Regions:
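C-terminal segment of classical bacterial N-terminal signal peptides
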Residues: 13-20
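A small/polar active-site loop signature that marks catalytic segments
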Residues: 155, 198-340, 344
Length: 434
């Protein structure tokens, strides 16, 4: 296993204890999951009138461009404004793709990049999209290849290497805006991605870059490698049916719980895209998106209006409701790997994309969540610890003029009205989750 260069700072903290300001955030692996935990059942919705009123006051004249849903651990819908209206979620889409990957692959899963020898003696390089694969890893692959011939004292023959990579048509979701593809956040999604296919901006041709650097490193070491491009297996199952191969060298990524943090805490688009593809076993983004939708359905979530177009949220064709996201958060809180999921998120006032938000307020250290931002879209969803237990909160705005202000006000309202002051048991309402 290679030494990873990720610096992700995962911390699993009891939800009742906020993180102290300025405290170090070391890597702590959550304990093994309990077994046979029950799936959540969304109970008939019960509204908290005081919270519902506060939400509408907070939103004011902007209510029509917002969707807000607040659930408690019983599945009661304590507050809901346009919660069933599908909206563009931006990076809140990562909450879906990371939940899917964690459920399907488990917290110890690692992405692998391998140099393989086929039964006929030929060599091939394949990968799974490790976002941390770097130049040092490439150098180790070159050394391993040269040991098979083409290096000083080994053989005068040039090493023939098949590099299996996705066709260019699969490098970007087709609906990603061309302007985004030039930036690091819009880098192409490939199986063999040195430095996540970004050097300042996006690398426009990652295969050509890999070929150039591999051959140059071999030449620097006195050897020669000739690279030929090959198609990867269509799916994981196809790869498993291939003839037995010998692993000559392998580089592995950080474990899943660290990859989740890279996607959710730091909002790394490349990682989220890779996780969705690996979870589905399909590197065609359209097929992987359909598999993600099926998984959401299998969780028993309210998915009316759901449309998955990518794994990161950069696509403007994604659609999801705040009710779906809040229900997913509740579902994952009951999941055997819930600790890993929550530990992957940013913390208000402390870490990740929330490090500079709500610092020194009642929300500091008490809200773990995921933010989302693309032009005209702001979203924030996550777990808010209150005196009455956790609240699963999702907010999505498409066209808000002052989203940051309203998101903070809404979170404070949820904190203030937990427990609901009007009654111990909130009144029933008709638009219940089913």
């Amino acid at each position: 296993m290679k030494k990873t260069v990720l610096s992700l700072g995962l911390l699993l903290i009891p939800f009742s204890e906020p993180v102290a300001a300025g405290a170090a955030v070391p890597l702590i692996i959550p304990p093994p999951p309990q077994t046979q935990q029950p799936l959540p059942q969304l109970q008939p919705a019960r509204v908290c009138p005081a919270l519902e009123k506060a939400l509408r006051v907070n939103l004011g004249g902007e209510a029509k461009v917002w969707s807000v849903t607040v659930l408690n651990s019983d599945g009661d819908v304590l507050g809901d404004v346009n919660g069933s209206v599908p909206r563009i979620p931006a990076s809140n889409q990562k909450l879906i793709s990371t939940a899917y990957a964690l459920d399907r692959l488990g917290p110890d899963f690692r992405l692998k990049t391998r140099l393989l020898q086929n039964p006929d003696g030929s060599l091939e390089l394949n990968g799974q999209g490790d976002p941390d694969l770097g130049i040092a890893g490439l150098q180790r692959f070159v050394l391993a290849a040269l040991r098979q011939g083409g290096g000083p004292g080994e053989s005068s023959n040039t090493v023939q290497l098949m590099v299996r990579e996705e066709p260019r048509s699969n490098w970007w979701p087709s609906d990603w805006h061309p302007a985004d593809r030039g930036y690091a956040y819009g880098a192409p999604i490939t199986r063999l991605a040195l430095t996540s296919n970004a050097v300042g901006g996006a690398v426009s041709d990652p295969y050509a870059r890999l070929q150039r650097l591999f051959e140059r490193e071999a030449q620097r070491r006195g050897g020669a490698v000739r690279i030929q491009r090959g198609q990867p297996p269509l799916s994981t199952s196809d790869a498993e049916r291939m003839d037995p191969q010998i692993v000559l060298h392998e580089e592995t990524s950080a474990p899943m719980h660290a990859l989740l943090s890279l996607a959710n805490t730091e909002s790394h688009n490349f990682t989220a895209e890779v996780l969705m593809r690996q979870a589905s076993g399909l590197w065609d983004v359209r097929a992987a998106s359909r598999a993600t939708e099926r998984w959401m359905y299998e969780q028993g979530l309210p998915i009316q209006g759901l449309r998955v177009a990518d794994g990161s949220g950069l696509s403007r064709n994604n659609r999801v409701t705040s009710r779906t996201i809040a229900a997913l958060l509740m579902r994952m809180d009951q999941h055997p790997f819930s600790a890993y999921y929550q530990a992957s998120m940013a913390i208000a006032g402390q870490r990740g994309t929330l490090r500079n938000l709500y610092r020194g307020s009642v929300l500091d250290g008490r809200f773990r969540g995921k933010t989302g931002t693309i032009s005209g879209v702001r979203s924030i969803s996550g777990y808010l610890q209150t005196a009455d237990g956790p609240r699963y909160v999702s907010m999505i705005s498409n066209g808000s003029v002052r989203p940051n202000t309203l998101m903070g006000q809404i979170l404070r309202s949820v904190q203030r009205f937990s427990p609901c002051p009007s009654s111990v048991a909130p009144a029933k309402r008709r638009d219940a989750l089913g």
